[in-house]
């Protein structure tokens, strides 16, 4: 996850090599909850306001293929019917998962993707999207 901070005339996104001048930032930004910005040919669809009017968090979302695989693993681990609607926004708790189920889901993800998830990272996973984003980060770190 990248973070961004606002300066007097530009917004610098630390993990991307770009900066935006004030003219590129929509006026009244403090009232927005999220905004999409094209940066160096990439779109950051989840640029969200956090603390203060010009402080942001950029969420780079995982590939749809990864999200779909995570959905299938979650359905299998929770023994959900095949026609159950599970998507990136699905919270494990809303699907009926308790803490043991969540541990089993993480173990299934580790096996499926050939990764190892640290306990601290596993505890931060609340949704299918959280899991998919973490998987892509860990798989990317292995390369």
UniProtKB/Swiss-Prot annotation:
InterPro entries: ACP (IPR003231), ACP-like_sf (IPR036736), ACP_chloroplastic (IPR044813), PP-bd_ACP (IPR009081), Ppantetheine_attach_site (IPR006162). Pathway: Lipid metabolism; fatty acid biosynthesis. It holds the Pfam family PP-binding. It is found in: Plastid, Chloroplast. The modification O-(pantetheine 4'-phosphoryl)serine is found at residue 99. Gene3D superfamilies: ACP-like. Residues 1-60 form a transit peptide. 4'-phosphopantetheine is transferred from CoA to a specific serine of apo-ACP by acpS. This modification is essential for activity because fatty acids are bound in thioester linkage to the sulfhydryl of the prosthetic group. SUPFAM superfamilies: ACP-like. Transmembrane segments: none annotated. The keyword Heme does not apply. GO terms for cellular component: chloroplast. GO terms for molecular function: acyl carrier activity. The keyword Transcription regulation does not apply. Carrier of the growing fatty acid chain in fatty acid biosynthesis. Belongs to the acyl carrier protein (ACP) family. This is Acyl carrier protein 3, chloroplastic. It comes from Cuphea lanceolata (Cigar flower). The lineage of its organism: Eukaryota, Viridiplantae, Streptophyta, Embryophyta, Tracheophyta. The gene is ACL1.3.
